C-alpha cells in the first residue's frame, strides 16, 4: 500500500491563491485518508477526508487566504479503507493510520 502526492510540494502567493495536488494510490487496496494542516487559519483543504481507489487518484485543492509569508505543511494520514465504508469521515475514526505523506507548503511574498 502506497500513497503519493503530485506535485510533492505546494508554493502559493502569501496574498492568496490555490494549488491542486493529485493523491495517487500505487497499491491494490482502496485507501482512506485524512488531511491535517499545520495552519488552519490561512489554508483551506478540500476534501479533508476521502477515498482513493486501487491504482486510482484523487484531486486535493489547497487554498491559501492572505497572510504573512511562512512555511507550513500538510500531513496526509492514510490506511486501508474498510470494505463497507461509504462515509470517509466516519470510517476514518475506526481505522489506525498505516502511513503518512507530508506536503511542504510555502507562502511567498
UniProtKB/Swiss-Prot annotation:
This is Sperm-specific class P protein 9/11. PANTHER family: MAJOR SPERM PROTEIN, MSP DOMAIN-CONTAINING PROTEIN-RELATED. The lineage of its organism: Eukaryota, Metazoa, Ecdysozoa, Nematoda, Chromadorea. Expressed at higher level in testis. It comes from the Eukaryota. SUPFAM superfamilies: PapD-like. It comes from Caenorhabditis elegans. InterPro entries: Ig-like_fold (IPR013783), MSP_dom (IPR000535), PapD-like_sf (IPR008962), Sperm-specific_class_P (IPR051774). Residues 2-109 form the MSP domain.
